From Swiss-Prot:
Protein's job: Involved in protein export. Acts as a chaperone by maintaining the newly synthesized protein in an open conformation. Functions as a peptidyl-prolyl cis-trans isomerase.
HAMAP family hit by this protein: Trigger_factor_Tig
Family: Belongs to the FKBP-type PPIase family. Tig subfamily.
Residues covered by the PPIase FKBP-type domain: 161-246
Biased composition (Acidic residues): 437-446
Organism: Hahella chejuensis (strain KCTC 2396)
Record-linked Gene3D superfamilies: 3.10.50.40, Trigger factor ribosome-binding domain, Trigger factor, C-terminal domain
Cross-referenced PANTHER family: TRIGGER FACTOR CHAPERONE AND PEPTIDYL-PROLYL CIS/TRANS ISOMERASE (PTHR30560), TRIGGER FACTOR-LIKE PROTEIN TIG, CHLOROPLASTIC (PTHR30560:SF3)
Signal peptide positions (record): none
Listed EC numbers: 5.2.1.8
Record-linked PROSITE patterns: FKBP_PPIASE
Gene: tig
Name of the molecule in the record: Trigger factor
Catalysis: reaction(s): [protein]-peptidylproline (omega=180) = [protein]-peptidylproline (omega=0)
Length: 446
């Protein structure tokens, strides 16, 4: 077998491979003989079909089958010979060959890049330190009450925090406009879902009331044709509801897994959960800083095959989480995910290099500790631990998570650390605000 290798970029390789004709013809002949022993054809006894007839009917198909297999086998052998690590599948370009000529083809493929990481001591990380005070616990309990609240019909005039069910119709210069009307829209006063003045205009209304609101769309409104426009909204209220909070009692505590010990035990459990949430949020912010700075220290070309694979994973994940079974992953534009996919692939390659360079690993003790940390938020933690430890696939996923943590801790130990004291509320905030997402609102007045 003859092999010649050409580098067409830092990560793309073009390999020309030649396989002797005798090797190809020998395998073709062997398979045709095997076919002749089993093939059934009208006018011939089984196993007695002349080879000339077998070749005429099956020769070309068998030859193409052999060529395909030999290209794959020769490609793998050539990779081993050249000590190459491909990233993704190759593109084969067979040259036209006639009977008796050597098989020659070109395999174009990408290899994993060489990842060189800069000085880890140049990385600087801000790490937050927090303290949970009693007021934080009380505030969390109030949030839990809000989450467990129920809407009850109210005959009172609508006030801040009430939910109204309304019909409304928007007009500009006496003409209705697209997205300016809705039926049975539910609006919570104070939610700031609607344009300025809309929710304030609902205060004091009761079920059955009607009102016209004269409002102005903001100059920075997302719809270009509505910016700064004066509009009238005819509103009819069909229902006013008020939020009813649950009492703080044993029944409320039981909803959150506290069966005994009363309010004191409940507050202890809430504080533990808050501490776990804050530690997780802080660790995630440290990881984000480490990742961002590692990316800045490492410049290399990313194999498109790996990016495409990550895009497909992200598409599938998006469909599972948001698609509701109504769409296919292929319907989502790849460009929506490409930038994030590139970042994920680069991060994975950098982390893998740090692991390799420093002989890092995730120990059994670390994996079990991570599983127990995760399980502690469930009502039956030991069952969760047992499930992970007895499920090889899930345990392997957890091993990957732990190994990422090991890399982050290793890099952070080399980095300059600045500790900053923050409140619980600041501790659980993300490092950067997520990008605003366009909403499929019920109306343009939102």
């Amino acid at each position: 077998m003859q092999v010649s290798l050409e580098s067409t970029s830092s990560i793309e390789r073009r390999m020309t491979i030649g396989v002797p004709a005798t090797q190809v013809n020998s395998e073709v002949e062997k398979r045709l003989q095997k076919t002749a022993r089993t093939v059934r054809m009208n006018g011939f006894r089984p196993g007695k079909v002349p080879m000339s007839v077998v070749k005429k009917r099956y020769g070309e198909g068998v030859r193409q089958e052999v060529i395909g297999e030999m290209m794959r086998d020769a490609y793998v052998e050539a990779l081993q010979k050249e000590d190459l690590n491909p990233a993704g599948y190759p593109k084969f370009e067979p040259k036209k060959i006639e009977d008796g000529e050597d098989l020659e083809f070109i395999a174009t493929f990408e290899i994993y890049p060489e990842v060189s990481i800069g000085d880890l001591s140049s990385i600087s990380v801000e790490k937050e330190d927090f303290e949970i005070v009693d007021a934080d616990v009380d505030s969390m309990i109030e949030k839990l009450r809000q989450q467990s609240s129920e809407w009850k019909d109210s005959e009172d005039a609508a006030a801040e925090g009430d939910r109204l069910t309304i019909d409304f119709k928007g007009m500009i210069d006496g003409e209705a406009f697209e997205g300016g009307s809705a039926q049975n829209a539910q609006i919570v006063i104070g939610s700031q879902r609607m344009i300025p003045g809309f929710e304030d205009g609902l205060v004091g209304l009761k079920a059955g009331d009607e009102k016209t609101l004269d409002l102005t769309f903001p100059e920075d409104y997302h719809a270009e044709n509505l910016k700064g426009k004066l509009a009238q909204f005819e509103v009819k209220v069909s229902k006013v509801e008020r939020s009813e909070l649950p009492e703080i009692n044993d029944e409320f505590f039981a909803q959150y897994g506290v069966q005994e010990g009363g309010e004191e035990a409940f507050k202890v459990e809430i504080r533990k959960n808050m501490e776990r949430e804050a530690r997780f949020a802080i660790a995630n912010k440290v990881k984000q800083q480490v990742v961002d700075q590692l990316l800045g220290l490492s410049e290399f070309e990313v194999p498109s095959a790996l990016v495409d694979s990550e895009v497909n994973r992200m598409r599938e994940d998006a469909v599972q989480r948001f698609g509701g079974g109504q769409m296919k992953a292929s319907q989502l534009p790849a460009e929506l995910f490409k930038d994030q996919a590139v970042k994920r692939v680069k991060t994975g390659l950098i982390f893998a290099q740090v692991v390799k360079d420093n002989n890092l690993e995730a120990t059994e003790e670390q994996i079990e500790a991570k599983i127990r940390e995760l399980a502690s938020s469930y009502q039956e933690p030991e069952q969760v631990v047992s499930w992970y430890m007895s499920n090889p696939e899930q345990k392997a996923q957890m091993q990957s998570v732990v190994l990422e943590d090991v890399v982050v801790d290793f890099v952070a130990d080399k980095a300059k650390i600045e500790t900053k004291s923050v409140s619980y509320e600041d501790a659980v905030k993300p490092r950067t605000a997520p990008a605003e997402q366009a909403e499929d609102g019920e109306q343009s007045a939102e």
